[in-house]
Amino acid sequence: GFYNFFFFGELALDGTIKDTSHIFAIVLSLAKKGELKKVVTSLESAKKLGNIPNIDVYIVNTLNNAIEFIKSKEKDNYLYEKEEIKYEVLNLKDEQYFYNKKYDEDFKDVIGQDMAKYAALICAAGNHNFLMEGSPGCGKSMIAKRLQYILTPMNLGEILEKAKLQALDFKDVDFSPIRAFRNPHHSSTKSSIFGGGSSNAKMGEVALSNNGVLFFDELPHFPSNILEALREPLEDNKILISRVNSKILYETKFIFVSAMNPCPCGNKLSSMKECRCSDFEVQRYKNRLSEPF
C-alpha cells in the first residue's frame, strides 16, 4: 500500500523540493524506532539519508516529480542507490567500526611532554576525564586538540548520531569517523554551553560533544555556576533542556578535558620564569574549582 511512504522536503516557490537541516534528524529518530521504512525526498536529502540502515529512499526533485511518483506503478525507478561509508573498516565482534588514517593534527607535532602524552593515551583508552596543569605554552592545548584522533573507532550508530547533531547545529554533515571536539571559550554564556533559548530548546556545547571531547581551556576562568552545572552531565551522561514549548533529553557521553595554569601568572612550574604570585593567590586561584568537581 501507499500509506507506508513518508514525504520530506521544503517546497520552493518554483516547485523544487529542497533539503532542510532537520530532515536527517527526524528520519534517523523515526528509523531507530522502526516507525518508517520508505522515505521520499530530494536528491540532496537522499545523499544523507542513504547512510541510515533498513530504510528505502526514493528521489523526487520537484512537485511534478512527486505527483508522477504517486501515480507510478514502478516506484523502484525512483529508488536511491545507497553508497557505503568510504573509510577504513575494523570488524570486531560482529560489528563494523570505521576510522580515518588522515589526521589534521598529530601527536608527533608535540615536542617532549612524554608524561602528558602518556596520560592522554590512558584517557583515550579508558574514556577518562583529563585535567592538565602547566605553564603557558607548554603544549596543553596542542595535546587536547589531538586527543580526538586517537579515540576508539566509531560504529555506524555513533557516526549517524554525530551527523544528526551536526544537522541540528546547522553544520554540513560529513559522516567522517572522527569524534567531535568542542572547545567553548571561558566567556561563553551558560545557555551556549548547556543549551537553551527563549522558547524552543536548542543544543549547547555539552550535547554537541556527545561521544567525543569537550575541552575547557583556562578552566579556573570559567564561572563557578558553569563548572557546578557541568557535574550533572558528567555524572549522568545526559542533560535535560526545558523551555516553554519543548523538553528535550540529550545524551552527554563525552570525555571532559581541561587545562589550567598552576597559578594566576602561570609561571609557578616554569624553569625559565619566576612566579610572582603569593601562596594566598595560588590557593585562591585553585579554590575556584570545588572539591566535588
Where are these regions (language model features)?
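Conserved alpha-helical scaffold flanking the Walker A/P-loop in AAA+ ATPase domains
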Residues: 121, 180, 191-214, 247
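AAA+/SF3 P-loop NTPase mechanochemical coupling elements
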Residues: 182, 205-211, 242-261, 289-293
